[in-house]
């Protein structure tokens, strides 16, 4: 099996667990992150979601997952397609979340870009509708 195919298998399992737990558990994510990771989110800390920003280590990512869990209720997370080439994988899907304070819902297409080395994720960047995020957070 190629590294690209193995990386897709790892991600499919992680996305399945994420959806099944409704965002309640991040252990499956932290298990695949390298100690040092270049991690980014399109919102870059805007819209009252300071945790949707850049991180450099797996330990720092606890802030990201704690913020999501505190502020948002996952309604749906569907990873539909995976495109893999070499050390990179892109996941295309959609998700919806309800803001716990405003009760407003974000339903957005989702694209995640991953890069792997030695079986661990060393880069991640997520893309989603930041206008909906802004509108739901206020």
Where are these regions (language model features)?
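A solvent-exposed, acidic/Ser-Thr-rich amphipathic alpha-helical stretch
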Residues: 31-87
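Charged, low-complexity, helix/coiled-coil-prone segments
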Residues: 1-14, 50-60, 80, 107-108
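Generic anion/oxyanion-binding catalytic loop in active/binding sites
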Residues: 18, 50, 103
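Short, low-complexity N-terminal intrinsically disordered segments enriched in polar/charged residues
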Residues: 1-35, 138
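A beta-strand edge to alpha-helix "cap/lid" segment located at domain peripheries
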Residues: 1-5, 66-138
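Hydrophobic aliphatic residue packing
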Residues: 10-11, 45, 61, 89-91, ...
